[in-house]
Amino acid sequence: MRAENLRELRDIKLTAAAPVSLNDLLRTEIPVRLCREVSNGKIRRLIMAGAVRLDGVPCRNPSALVRAGASVSVRVDVGKLFYEKPVNDIAFELTARDVLYEDEYIIVVNKPACFPTEAGMVASRDNLHAAVVRYLFANARRSRPNLRNPPYAGIMHRLDRETSGVILFTKSREVNAACHALFEERVAQKTYRAVVSPAPRRMRCSVEMFMGRISPKSQPAKWGAVAERDGGVYARTDISVVAQGDLGGKPIAFVECRPHTGRTHQIRVHLASLGAPILGDVLYGGQRYARIMLHAQTLSFPHPVTHEPISITAPLPSGFDL
């Protein structure tokens, strides 16, 4: 039997009782009609995909006003709507060897590649934040075996799923504001190592541009150059070539990146703009590889409580040096 014959198509017809946005109407009614929870992201994808008609006219605007008495029809491919792309996250449990620094206020760990920093839309998907909480809980219960509530761990910054390296969590809400300020005010200094192909033309350079999202919300998030007048935000990265080599007959370079700002996908976009995309970063023109070869190597900052300078380095994973 052909796959399309197995699709479950549902035609849902709605009438607005009062003025409401299209997105809000569907968020309320679609879960009721399908008898299951539907995330806001899935509702928006339905709209953006052209599955919704407002008074018989296709409507792709989630914010469109639906007047009282207006008719809305939705064609739902149930299987496609609830399909979750299988993830190939690694299985990971935080151990003492993954902890780069810890005191009563903060914990800094070495994040593995191919493991998300925090929880996403799939509730059952493991993540580093959950692993840190489990680690802290297990340690706390060694001295207090009857402890029932897991300890607090605050996310201060994030790394992309495929990026490895240094990441900081707080252990107390009281230091959150001070830690947030370290990153918001660019007091914390970060150094990344990347493997690119081909090598940048210059051994040292700084990339400066205004950045923003350049892909539609219905597609995977992609960032790039966006003029300031169009909402772009300033971003700068200092880049230097550490070494050059060869991989399967193709030239590669090992580069050090020092971001002065913290924009989404900043280093990936800046390296791609030099014609030297990161190995494995297919979204930005890189060659296919087992992972995106980007590693957060060093994080330096004054301690949020003692103000003593701290510099923490995560060892380079295999493949990041000659």
Name the predicted role of every residue range.
Residues 1-322:
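RNA pseudouridine synthases
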